[in-house]
C-alpha cells in the first residue's frame, strides 16, 4: 500500500495482479517442487532484483553523463549521438557486481539495452492512477514503479519497458499478467505524466541465463487494451476488499 502526500491510498500493481491471477498453474508448480518451491522463488526474486539494479544503474549513469555533456554545450535536448556516447561510457564504468545466480541474466539485459536503446525519458518512475469516476472508502487507485521509458533504435516513438528474468520460457498466462502490468503503468503515465507524450507501445524483455532474451511487443492499441484489462482486474480486486462497497464508474 502506498500513501501519497495528500493522504490518498493506492494499492500495489503487483499485489493486485497477484490477487486477481489464476493461480492453478502456480499451485501445480508448488506441488511439483515441494519443499524446494520457497527456495526457488527466493532465488528468482533475488536474481531479478540484482539484474534490474544493474540495468537501472547503466541507464542512470548514462543519463548523468549525457545531461552533463549537453549542459556543457548549451543544448536543450540530448542528441542521439551524445546518448550513444554516454551509454557506451556507462558500459565502460564499473556496475554493481552480480553473483553467479544472476550474472547471466544481467549480461542478457545489458546486451539488449546496448543494442537497442537510443535514449531514455524515465527510469524507475513511480506512478499512481485513479480510474475515472472511481470512489471507494478503502483505496483511491493503484500505484507502481515502471522500469523504463526508452527510445529504441529500431522502432519509432517512446516505449514502456519492463525487465523480467526467467530460467524457463513463460507461458501465456504469466505473459498476460506482464502485459496487464504494462497496462497499469500506461494508465498512470497518461493521467499524471503528460510530458512523456504517451507511448508508442510496450515491451517486456525477459532475460535468460544464456543467449538472447525473450522479447514481447505490444503496439499502442494493444497497450490500451491491456490498460482496460487491468482496470477490470482492479475493479474485481476492490470488490473483494468489501462486497458491499461502492465502485461507481467501474
Question: What are these regions, as identified by a protein language model?
Answer:
Residues 1-143:
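Metal-dependent nuclease catalytic cores that hydrolyze phosphodiester bonds in DNA/RNA
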Residues 124-247:
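Mg2+/Mn2+-dependent nuclease catalytic core
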Amino acid at each position: 500500500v502506498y500513501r501519497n502526500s495528500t493522504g490518498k491510498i493506492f494499492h500495489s500493481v503487483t499485489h493486485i495482479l497477484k490477487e486477481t491471477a489464476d493461480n492453478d498453474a502456480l499451485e501445480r508448480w508448488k506441488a511439483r517442487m515441494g519443499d524446494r518451491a520457497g527456495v526457488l522463488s527466493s532465488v528468482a526474486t533475488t536474481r531479478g532484483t540484482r539484474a534490474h539494479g544493474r540495468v537501472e544503474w547503466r541507464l542512470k549513469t548514462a543519463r548523468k553523463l549525457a545531461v552533463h555533456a549537453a549542459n556543457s554545450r548549451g543544448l536543450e535536448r540530448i542528441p542521439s549521438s551524445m546518448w550513444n556516447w554516454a551509454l557506451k561510457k556507462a558500459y565502460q564504468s564499473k556496475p554493481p557486481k552480480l553473483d553467479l545466480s544472476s550474472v547471466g541474466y544481467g549480461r542478457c539485459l545489458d546486451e539488449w539495452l546496448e543494442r537497442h536503446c537510443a535514449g531514455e525519458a524515465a527510469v524507475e518512475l513511480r506512478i499512481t492512477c485513479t480510474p475515472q469516476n472511481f470512489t471507494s472508502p478503502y483505496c483511491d487507485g493503484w500505484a507502481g514503479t515502471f522500469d523504463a521509458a526508452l527510445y529504441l533504435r529500431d522502432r519509432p516513438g517512446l516505449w514502456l519497458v519492463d525487465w523480467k528474468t526467467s530460467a524457463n520460457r513463460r507461458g501465456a498466462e504469466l505473459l498476460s499478467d506482464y502485459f496487464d502490468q504494462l497496462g497499469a503503468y500506461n494508465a498512470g503515465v497518461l493521467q499524471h505524466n503528460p510530458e512523456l507524450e504517451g507511448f508508442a507501445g510496450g515491451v517486456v524483455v525477459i532475460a535468460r541465463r544464456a543467449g538472447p532474451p525473450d522479447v514481447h511487443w505490444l503496439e499502442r492499441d494493444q497497450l490500451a487494451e491491456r490498460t482496460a484489462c487491468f482496470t477490470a482486474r482492479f475493479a474485481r480486486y476492490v470488490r473483494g476488499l468489501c462486497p458491499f462497497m461502492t465502485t461507481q464508474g467501474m
